[in-house]
Amino acid sequence: MRAEIISIGTELLLGEIINTNAQYIARELASLGIDVYHQSVIGDNETRLSEAFETAFKRSDVVITTGGLGPTKDDMTKETAASFFGKKLIPHEESLKKIEAYFKGRGLNVNEGNRKQGYFPEGSIVLPNPNGTAPACIIEENNKKLILLPGPPREMIPLFETQVLPYLKKFQDKFFSFKVLNVCGIGEGEMEEAIMDIVDHQTNPTVAPYAKPNGLTLRIAASGHTQKEADELIHPMEEQIRERLGLNIYGEDDISLEEIVAKILIEKKLTISIAESCTGGFLSGRLVNYPGISSVFMEGIVTYSNESKVKYLGVNPQTIEKYGAVSEEVAREMAEGICKSAHTNIGLSVTGLAGPSGGREDKPIGLVYVGICINGVTTVKELNLGGSRNRIRSLATTYTLDLLRREVLNRSL
């Protein structure tokens, strides 16, 4: 089965809001094994939307739209769909009653714009919207399906999960299973080289690598005549990939690197304190995203100036004078200093040059040192990163979390 997504709204077309609906729907359809080959964004224009329907139904079995179901004149998705299929818009009494009750309960009058939300192309399957006044609907015509959904994600997502997914599952002829492996610490080329023979000879399951801002992912997908069959095909492929990539794989599916690190620290009862310079609080911010981290995260401090490194971390001024603030030696003293002052098992430090100015030949922009002091034993890692100032800071944060993860696991603490 092939599906196409049409997102409706001039605000989307002009880039005024981000189109998260299409991303969500595409992922959900993929989980059902429904192929999505095309997506489009159409402004609030009846002619262009009708043309989009014409094109979409020539190549797709299911067309899903979001937006254009509101009470205003430029909300014309249902009107365009009715015209496209040669159908009339007719009242749906249950929806009209709910709309009237909604406004009456708030002491408001129902106008014609509100009432039109209770009208649908004749023969439609109406899907109630418990989170808004715009019900969705499904139109079935000539073995094709048009699904009209509201635009606000807080309305669209619950409606899709509870009503659209069960509807689409009735047409499944295969079952699908997916596993996403999250990778950090190696480049895309290095990862691809390590698993190239697997990728080249894939049939079922398939393996697809993706680059993301904070790392890489590998998506394993399998199909079968039953869900159990599809699930069982994933495991051998996953084991093969894990054997190749080892500790470079830090987690699965939607789990974040900071969540993995937090869980390791909590499980091993390792307290941590952090001293940041170039990352300016990014590192502490990422770690406190995880609920429960307060049981092990004792202290975080941004020591941006040389004076603050000396004052709060006890870094020797002569070390800074001799080696510079961005150096292995200063990163070491920062990590040991925060560990000592906070009385924690782990002291973590980051110092570097994020740019855009200040670099030189022996210390270029993107040079970062990470200090990790664990129970009195300190290691320092050098990173050479590229990109904008914020990109370097973000990458430094990610790599620091990953280096901490590896150090703790390698030491078998």
Swiss-Prot record:
SUPFAM superfamilies named in the record: CinA-like, Molybdenum cofactor biosynthesis proteins
Pfam families for this protein: CinA, CinA_KH, MoCF_biosynth
Superkingdom as given in the UniProt entry: Bacteria
Transmembrane segments: none
InterPro entries xref list: CinA (IPR050101), CinA-like_C (IPR036653), CinA_C (IPR008136), CinA_KH (IPR041424), Competence-induced_CinA (IPR008135), MoaB/Mog-like_dom_sf (IPR036425), MoaB/Mog_dom (IPR001453)
The family this protein is said to belong to: Belongs to the CinA family.
HAMAP family recorded: CinA_B (MF_00226_B)
Name recorded for this polypeptide: Putative competence-damage inducible protein
Organism: Alkaliphilus oremlandii (strain OhILAs) (Clostridium oremlandii (strain OhILAs))
